[in-house]
A protein has these predicted regions:
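Alpha-helical transmembrane-bundle signature of multi-pass membrane transport and export proteins
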Residues: 1-428
Length: 428
């Protein structure tokens, strides 16, 4: 809330936001440890085949398509803070079951599949509730800053998490590293429990008029398609994800098989993407203030992302740095745009619809990831890896046209006024 002078206090002095942000950062770091440790548990302890490890990866990534839409509707029905706490406690138990089963000699691949799927389901519920709860804590004029800090912590976790995971695996084994991740969720739950801010309770008469679960899901999808800025931003994210997964999948193949780089150098080049995410999260608020929060969203993806076209030009020797520069530029631009677009969704959407609207947007945008992976693999087989990378980076840069040809192009700043009321009943 503004102070007596009409100014908004620094977000660094916002106790509840710092507790939320800190708890999420700890669990993000732990989750990145598990990204490395879970397949190692399967390979090292259970001698899983490549196909079985692929099934494990599919179980980890399928939850958004399976439960994102009902998760959003449920998040709008229950207290979001309480939902996040229970999700963290559930993740503590689910992830913690792996080192416990390994200690008593009862660990199986079936359990790992179940852990991967169930933990991803709880992660989806947490993520939807988290994004919906942030506007409860922060004033609308603080959302850009808050979302930028969340993006920074996510990118830092992507950089430091795998290194931390590798160190923990070397020190205490893969199962022990998962025990550390389980502990991170317990710490996050404790941090959230200390938050004092509570959501406004829905009046009982209003709650009685609330439509059923599937009607609410339809409302969320309808809201996304009805709002022209949301509609174009979802189309942008879905298109960008479709192409970026091609780069993430085929980039290592290109660097190892075409340029014959050592795996350590490949990992370093790919990690630069997270560095770009950190820089984008830090710079998002400054660029929004100087250029305009609406204007920077489309400028970042139509102008600042253009060095991404250097990725397929990478060659031997120092020319390999073109890959790193292109990748860091692309992730910087997409993070800046993402912070602005997330802030718009949080500010424009009615609070009691934010969960299902966020879930609907993510269901659409994340749903293009498996499709992009399949299409990228097919194109690489037919046309070659480098040619497919050209298609991917060109398509990723063109994704910004969804934002250019949207109402954002006629605005300097995203509107942060009072959102339109949510519809009551089963019709959008």
């Amino acid at each position: 809330m503004p102070d007596d002078n009409g100014k908004h206090p620094s977000i660094w002095r916002h106790r509840d936001f710092l507790l939320l942000w800190g708890g999420q950062t700890v669990s993000e770091m732990g989750s990145q440890v598990t990204v490395l440790a879970l397949p190692l548990v399967a390979v090292v302890l259970l001698e899983a085949s490549a196909f079985q490890v692929g099934l494990l990866s599919a179980a980890e990534t399928s939850a958004y398509l399976l439960v994102a839409l009902p998760a959003g509707a449920i998040a709008d029905r229950v207290p979001k803070l309480r939902l996040m706490i229970w999700c963290n406690l559930a993740l503590f138990l689910v992830i913690g079951s792996v080192p416990l089963a390994q200690a008593v000699g009862a660990l199986t691949l079936a359990q790992l599949y179940a852990v991967a799927l169930v933990s991803s389901v709880f992660s989806v519920f947490f993520s939807v509730a988290y994004q919906s709860y942030l506007p409860v804590l922060l004033d609308r004029n603080q959302l850009m800053d808050g979302n930028g800090k969340v993006a920074v912590s996510r990118s830092v976790a992507q950089i430091a998490g795998p290194s931390l995971g590798a160190g923990l695996v070397a020190l205490i084994g893969a199962a022990g590293a998962m025990a550390a991740d389980a502990l991170s969720f317990a710490l996050s739950a404790g941090s959230l429990t200390a938050i004092r801010t509570r959501e406004r309770r829905r009046p009982s008469a209003e709650a009685d008029r609330r439509p059923g679960l599937w009607a609410q899901i339809r409302e969320g999808l309808a809201y996304v398609t009805r709002d022209p800025i949301l509609r174009n931003s979802v189309a942008f994210n879905g298109t960008a994800n479709f192409f970026v997964i091609m780069v993430e999948t085929l980039g290592p193949v290109f660097l190892i098989r075409t340029l014959h780089l050592r795996p350590a150098l490949v990992g370093l080049l790919l990690a630069l993407g997270a560095v770009g995410g950190v820089a984008g999260g830090v710079a998002a608020r400054y660029l929004a203030r100087k250029v305009g929060s609406a204007r920077i969203s489309w400028i970042s993806m139509t102008v600042l992302s253009l060095p991404g076209l250097l990725i397929p030009l990478a060659g031997h020797g120092w020319w390999v740095l073109l890959f790193g520069f292109g990748w860091i530029s692309w992730t910087f631009a997409s993070t800046v745009a993402g912070v602005s677009l997330t802030t718009y969704r949080q500010a424009a959407c009615p609070p009691d619809m934010l969960g299902r609207v966020s879930a609907a947007a993510r269901w659409i945008t994340w749903g293009t990831l498996p499709l992009g992976g399949v299409v990228g693999g097919a194109l690489a087989t037919a046309l070659g890896v480098q040619t497919t990378l050209w298609i991917a980076v060109a398509g990723g840069c063109c994704a910004g046209l969804w934002l250019f040809f949207s109402p954002l192009r006629g605005m300097r700043d995203i509107p942060l006024g009072k959102p339109e009321p949510a519809p009551v009943g089963g019709k959008p």
